[in-house]
Every structure is written in C-alpha cells, then in structure tokens.
C-alpha cells in the first residue's frame, strides 16, 4: 500500500501541498502554485514556470501538477525536495529570494542541489527494487514447503531413489530393447488386391523391349472432299515423323508418304518441303515455258533498240497512236492552215497567260511609280492647303491685334 501511495500523483501532491512552504511559489511567493520544477523539487506559479521553460530542459524541467503525468522517479524527486529544503540550500550558498532567475538556476549552487537530489532519488529507487525481490523470495519458499509437505532436500532424495530404481533393473530394459528389435518389419497383408497395391510382373520388360516389332503406320484413306486440306488434315494423325505430298495428275488426287530423310526433288524451296500441293504442276510447267518463249521473243525484237517502253513491250502503242492520229485527221481535214495552239488545244485567251519574270517585274515597278507619284501629288496638295490655312489664321490674328 505504501508503494501505491508513492506512485499516485494526487496523493503525493496532496501531502506536499499541505505544508505551508509549498503553498506559495518558490521564486515570486505567489499563492496556490500549480506547476513544479522536477530537477529541483520546487513549486512554481504559471509565470515563473514560463521563465523556467525558457531556460531549457537541461537546466529546469517544468511540469503541471494537475494536467501532466508523472513517473515514480519524478514524484520521488518532489518528495525529497520541496520549497523549504531548496530555500535553505540556496541561502547557505549565498542566494536570497531576490535576484534574477536565470543567474540563480545557472549558478554552481543550483547545479550542486540538482545533483544531490538526483543521487538521493537513484539510491532510493535502487533500494525499492532490491527489497521487494527479497521479500517475494522469502514468502515463496514456505508456501512451497507447506504445499508439498517436504523440505527442500526431499526432491534430492526422491531423485536418488529414482536413479537407484533405474540402475537396479538393467536386465528388464535390455529385454525390452531386444524384443523390439526382434520384431520383423513386414507389411500387413490386406484382403483386397486392387487400388494402389503392387502386382508381380509376368514378363521382363528389358528382354522384350528389343524383340517388339515397330508399330505399323495407319493406312491413309483418301478423303472424299474436293479440297486437299481435309485430306491432309485427316492423314496428319498417322505419324509424327511423316509428311504427305499431294499430287494432281489427270484430274485425280492422291497422297504419297515420304520418308523423313527423303532427298530433295528440286531446287525449289516449297517443293522440297511438300508445299507444292496448292499449285498444280502442269500449269506451272506450261507457264514457265511460256515465260521462256516470251523472253526469247522480246530479246530478239528489242536487241538493237536503245530504249524500250512498256507500251512497246506489251504491244499497246500502235492502238493508242492510231486512235490519236485518226482524231487529229478528222479534226483538221477541211482546214487550210493549222497553228500550234489549234494542234495542242490552246485557246486565243491563253496567249496572255505566258508572262516572263522580267515582264512581271516591269509591270510591278510601273505600278509602284504611279502610286508614288500620286502620293507625292497628294502630299503637295495637303502642304499647300495647310500653308494657305496657316497664313489666313496669321493674318486674322494680326488684324485683331491692330
């Protein structure tokens, strides 16, 4: 109960404030102080607490006795301190109630008083931590003896008896160990042989592995659909290492199975890998012959020509030339003379369109000269008008003054 009273903030401050010296401020003697300086254990008013707070926490640490929370060490410092003890200590070292607060609490006397309180509080807290531990040990030992009904030496005796019992019966333990090792580790037989049970192999797989015949490829049935894609898709399930080459000859379609290392049939990349099924072979051979013939004919025809146009190569130039010549002959069949404008379709108004750069510059410069002359004439006229107007005003002023 005593320790609980010491840690209770309200109880501690109620006892401390019951003393007459703690009912006034330590620095200014104001009544009912509600603040305190923890390092010195003194009570302060709110004004003096502000001054202490300005000094810094390394000199004075201020807390409220009503609002702030206090630790047991801080409460013990207030109990060891007090206004009366601090006042006596400062007077012994030459400090009275008057004077500056900053100089008072930064002096050597204030430092010594702060260290003295800190040492006393540390010593008291250490004694409090040692005494409760000793008392708890002293009270726990008789309780254990009363509950067990034996002294502290009884556990030792019981342990010795147990060790003797273990030593006296070594044969029994050996027998038990031997019996455990003699039991064979055999799995229990179950009535059912299904499920995950193991079965005995009738034949050896290693001996018969090389004697087995390779699986025969599934015979390929030609598809009845007209397209070649369905037949290739249906026969693709035969083997993983086989591919098919579709050929079309005489309107009949068929498939031919080739080995995996078949030699190349031709230099064509697509024919080598069986991708010529999409293009008929007869048409390709005929087209190649036609191309050879055309190239030979073109080489013979244009061997001496310096340049060749597409119209000449494909034979379309004669047709277009004949149409143009017929149109021009029909147009000018009854005329006595033909001009270039009539021949190329230019009208009489189109002759003014073709203007050279020099003509354009001459026209622009002539227009600019005309504009400048008109501007100069306008400026001359305005100058004359302003002169006549100014002279008339000046003459009127002279007449009025005279």
From Swiss-Prot:
Annotated spans, Disordered: 133-166, 187-234, 278-303
Entry keywords, A to Z: Acetylation, GTPase activation, Metal-binding, Phosphoprotein, Zinc, Zinc-finger
Amino acid composition bias (Polar residues), ranges on this chain: 133-153, 225-234
PTM annotation (N-acetylalanine): residues: 2
Highest taxon of the lineage: Eukaryota
CDD domains: ArfGap_ArfGap2_3_like
A molecular function (GO) term: GTPase activator activity
A GO cellular component annotation in the UniProt record: plastid
Chain ranges of zinc fingers (C4-type): 25-48
Zinc listed as a keyword: yes
InterPro entries given in the database record: ARFGAP/RecO, ArfGAP_dom, ArfGAP_dom_sf
Residue numbers bearing the Phosphoserine modification: 307
Family matches, as Pfam families: ArfGap
Domain Arf-GAP intervals: 10-128
Bias kind Basic and acidic residues: ranges: 204-216
Xref: PANTHER family: ADP-RIBOSYLATION FACTOR GTPASE ACTIVATING PROTEIN 3, ISOFORM H, ADP-RIBOSYLATION FACTOR GTPASE ACTIVATING PROTEIN 3, ISOFORM H-RELATED
Summary of the function given for this chain in its UniProt record: GTPase-activating protein (GAP) for ADP ribosylation factor (ARF).
Name of protein: Probable ADP-ribosylation factor GTPase-activating protein AGD9
Source organism of the structure: Arabidopsis thaliana
Lineage per the UniProt record: Eukaryota, Viridiplantae, Streptophyta, Embryophyta, Tracheophyta
């Amino acid at each position: 109960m005593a320790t609980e009273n010491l840690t209770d903030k309200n109880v501690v401050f109620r006892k401390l404030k019951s003393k007459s010296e703690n009912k006034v401020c330590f620095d200014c003697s104001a009544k009912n102080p509600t603040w305190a300086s923890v390092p010195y254990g003194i009570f302060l008013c709110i004004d003096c607490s502000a001054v202490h707070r300005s000094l810094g926490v390394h000199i004075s640490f201020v807390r409220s006795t009503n609002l702030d929370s206090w630790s047991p060490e801080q409460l013990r410092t207030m109990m060891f301190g007090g206004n009366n003890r601090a006042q006596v200590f400062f007077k012994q070292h030459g400090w009275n109630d008057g004077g500056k607060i900053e100089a008072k609490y930064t002096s050597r006397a204030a430092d010594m008083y702060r260290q003295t309180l800190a040492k006393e509080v540390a010593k008291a807290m250490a004694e409090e931590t040692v005494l409760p531990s000793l008392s708890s040990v002293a009270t726990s030992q008789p309780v254990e003896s009363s509950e067990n009904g034996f002294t502290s030496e009884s556990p030792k005796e019981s342990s010795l008896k147990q060790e003797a019992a273990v030593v006296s019966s070594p044969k029994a333990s050996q027998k038990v160990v031997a019996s455990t090792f003699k039991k064979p580790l055999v799995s229990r037989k179950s009535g059912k042989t299904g499920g995950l049970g193991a079965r005995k192999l009738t034949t050896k797989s290693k001996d018969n592995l090389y004697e087995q015949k390779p699986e025969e490829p599934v015979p390929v049935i030609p598809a009845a659909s007209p397209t070649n894609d369905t037949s290739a898709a249906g026969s693709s399930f035969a083997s993983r290492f086989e591919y098919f080459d579709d050929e079309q000859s005489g309107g009949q379609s068929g498939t031919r199975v080739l080995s995996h290392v078949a030699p190349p049939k031709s230099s064509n990349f697509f024919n080598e890998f069986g991708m010529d099924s999409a293009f008929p072979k007869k048409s390709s051979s005929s087209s190649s012959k036609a191309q050879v013939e055309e190239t030979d004919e073109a080489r013979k025809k244009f061997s001496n020509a310096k340049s060749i146009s597409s119209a000449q190569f494909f034979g379309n130039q004669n047709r277009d030339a004949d149409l143009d010549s017929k149109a021009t002959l029909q147009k000018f069949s009854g005329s006595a003379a033909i001009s270039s404008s009539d021949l190329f379709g230019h009208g009489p108004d189109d002759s003014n369109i073709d203007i050279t750069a020099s003509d354009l510059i001459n026209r622009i410069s002539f227009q600019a000269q005309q504009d400048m002359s008109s501007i100069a004439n306008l400026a001359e006229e305005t100058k004359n008008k302003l002169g006549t107007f100014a002279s008339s005003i000046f003459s009127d002023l002279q007449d009025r003054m005279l």
